């Protein structure tokens, strides 16, 4: 790679970071490797300690995306700044109530949330979440404090280096083209490009509960680790996930 990764897509869970990443990946001037999409590098020590050359090895061009960078703002923002102080930051935001419900549904589906919605909120209020994964995934209330998280990025990057994208516009088909042209303009890339705005990151009830359990709660997927490259395992996992999702919605009691 000729230069450092220069674009980072950050934001709240379920706020459109993956969609922006996938749409940008269609552009011929942008390299957004699918195998490390949503890869926790700057905010997860185990990955960060592999070294920046490990991350850069996936890129021929200069764009990188991962969720939760904004939530772990101080840690990730500082590391991104130390890596590339001239980086451009795209921050994705969403109505915090809708975001919390969507995140809850997702973690129920992948078997990382077993409580009812009200029970999950109470556990967070009581301070019962301790591990990195719990703090990353199951903090439905804490994730809503966008102001503090944004201020952390403004501490390291100028306002001109930050562009905001709102989920409510991202899912509005009448605004998608304009939204992406604004993103391209922010990145100083030619805006006359027609994106394919296919549905991304579909959610729903798994078709096979057994397959879903094997994938998320057993060591079976890890058995392939010594034999299959990381990039292939990521693509295979994503494809299995897509094929096993039905159109039926997960119901949430918010009373």
Predicted regions and their residues:
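PAPS-dependent sulfotransferase catalytic domain
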Residues: 46-56, 113-196
């Amino acid at each position: 790679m000729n230069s450092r990764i220069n674009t980072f897509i950050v934001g709240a869970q379920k706020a459109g970071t993956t969609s922006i990443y996938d749409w940008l990946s269609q552009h011929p001037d942008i390299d957004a490797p699918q195998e490390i999409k949503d890869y926790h590098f700057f905010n997860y020590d185990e990955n960060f300690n592999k070294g920046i050359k490990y991350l850069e090895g996936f890129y021929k061009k200069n764009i990188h995306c991962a969720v939760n960078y904004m939530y772990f703002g101080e840690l990730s923002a500082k590391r991104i700044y130390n890596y590339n102080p001239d980086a451009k930051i795209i921050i994705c935001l969403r109505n915090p109530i809708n975001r919390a419900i969507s995140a809850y549904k997702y973690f129920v589906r992948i078997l990382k949330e077993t409580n009812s919605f009200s029970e999950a909120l109470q556990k967070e209020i009581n301070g019962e979440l301790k591990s990195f994964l719990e703090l990353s995934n199951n903090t439905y209330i804490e994730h809503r404090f966008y102001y503090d998280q944004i201020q952390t990025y403004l501490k390291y990057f100028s306002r001109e280096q930050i562009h905001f994208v709102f989920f409510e516009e991202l899912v509005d088909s009448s605004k998608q083209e304009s939204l992406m042209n604004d993103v391209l303009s922010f990145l100083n890339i030619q805006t006359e490009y027609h994106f394919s705005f296919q549905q991304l990151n579909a959610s729903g009830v798994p078709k096979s509960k057994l397959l879903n359990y094997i994938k998320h709660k057993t060591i079976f997927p890890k058995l392939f680790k010594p034999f299959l490259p990381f990039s292939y395992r990521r693509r295979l996992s994503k494809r299995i996930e897509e094929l096993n999702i039905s159109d039926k919605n997960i119901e949430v009691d918010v009373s």
